[in-house]
C-alpha cells in the first residue's frame, strides 16, 4: 500500500505532535524550521471538583478529545493527515494511562500513513522549549535549566540535544506539588498554583518566617516536604478543626505570599549552586508549569544577572503542558541528524533523561 499523496501547498516536512502526559490534551503542527503552523489544547475540568487529577478520568478524556482536536489543528494549519511528514508523541514520563492513549494515537496515524514516529521525553520537551525559533531567544548550548512543575523538579545542565547532566532533583515533593497541596490547605480551588499566586498578591511575603529546606547546603537537590509541614502547622494555629472555611483572608494571603517567597528563595539558592558547578553555562533557563510563577521567575532572573548571563523563560502558554514543545523536541532530534522510527517504544511513567528512548515493551521496568 502506497502512502497518500501530499497536497502541493503543504509546507516542507510538517510534524504533528500529541501531548497527553497528565490532564491536558494537546496537539500541534510545526514546520521543519520550527514555525508553529497550528496548535490546540483542551484542559480537563472534571478534576477541579475532585481536588486533583484522577488518572482514569484523564485517560478517558484524552481518548474522547483527540480525534476532534487533531482534526481542528489540521484545519487551522490548512493541512490533511497526508501532508504530515512525521508524527511524535509524549511517551513518558507521566500518567501511564494518558501516555498510552496519546502515544498510541500518534503511532496509529504514523503506521496508517507509513510515516516515522518520534517518542518524546516530556522532561526533554520542557528543557528544549526556550530554543523554539519563534521565541527569538539567542539560546545556545550549554545552558542550565531549572525544571519546575507539578511532577518534576530538577536542575539540569543541557550540554546539547540528547545530552543532559542532572545536577540535582527533589528528594520528596516537587515544587508544583507543594504549591497545589498548600493551596488545598488554604481552601483554594484546583489547580492550586495559579490560585495561590493570585492570593499571594494580597499578602506580605515576610509575614511568616517559613523554613528554606536545604538552602545554603552543598549540592543541587530540593526538598519541600518540611516547608509544606511548616505551613500546615501554621494554618492549624488559626484553624485547628481543619475546616479551612474560617481562615481570615489576610492570614491566608500572608501565608501564600510567605510560602511562595520561601520556594523562590530555595530555587534561587539551588540555581546558584548549580551555576557554580556549570562554569560554562551560557544562560539560565526556567521551564515547566511552575515557571509561570512571576515571583520564581524574578528570583531566578536575579541569579542570572548576578552571574552576568542571560535568563530565559518560555511564555506562559508554553510553560504548562503543550504539544508545541513536544513537536519542537522531536524536530531538535531530527535537526541533530537522528533518524528515529520508534514505533515499537512503550509508554512508561518514568523515563530518566539519561535514557535516549524508552524501553521496548518486553524490557520495561
Swiss-Prot record:
Cofactor section: Fe(2+)
Entry's localization field: Cytoplasm
GO MF: iron ion binding; N(6)-L-threonylcarbamoyladenine synthase activity
Region (Disordered): 340-365
Alphabetized PROSITE patterns for the sequence: GLYCOPROTEASE
Xref: InterPro entries: ATPase_NBD, Gcp-like_dom, KAE1/TsaD, Peptidase_M22_CS, TsaD
GO annotation, cellular component aspect: cytoplasm
Disulfide bonds: none
Gene that produces this protein: tsaD
Annotated substrate binding sites: 147-151, 180, 193, 293
Enzyme Commission designation: 2.3.1.234
Pfam family, one: TsaD
Keyword field: Acyltransferase, Cytoplasm, Iron, Metal-binding, Transferase, tRNA processing
Cofactor binding note: Binds 1 Fe(2+) ion per subunit.
Function: Required for the formation of a threonylcarbamoyl group on adenosine at position 37 (t(6)A37) in tRNAs that read codons beginning with adenine. Is involved in the transfer of the threonylcarbamoyl moiety of threonylcarbamoyl-AMP (TC-AMP) to the N6 group of A37, together with TsaE and TsaB. TsaD likely plays a direct catalytic role in this reaction.
Any one biological process term the GO annotation gives: tRNA threonylcarbamoyladenosine modification
Family the entry assigns: Belongs to the KAE1 / TsaD family.
Cleavable signal peptide: none
Chemical reaction(s) catalysed: L-threonylcarbamoyladenylate + adenosine(37) in tRNA = N(6)-L-threonylcarbamoyladenosine(37) in tRNA + AMP + H(+)
Broad EC category: transferase
Identification of the protein by name: tRNA N6-adenosine threonylcarbamoyltransferase
Binding positions for Fe cation per the UniProt entry: 122, 126, 321
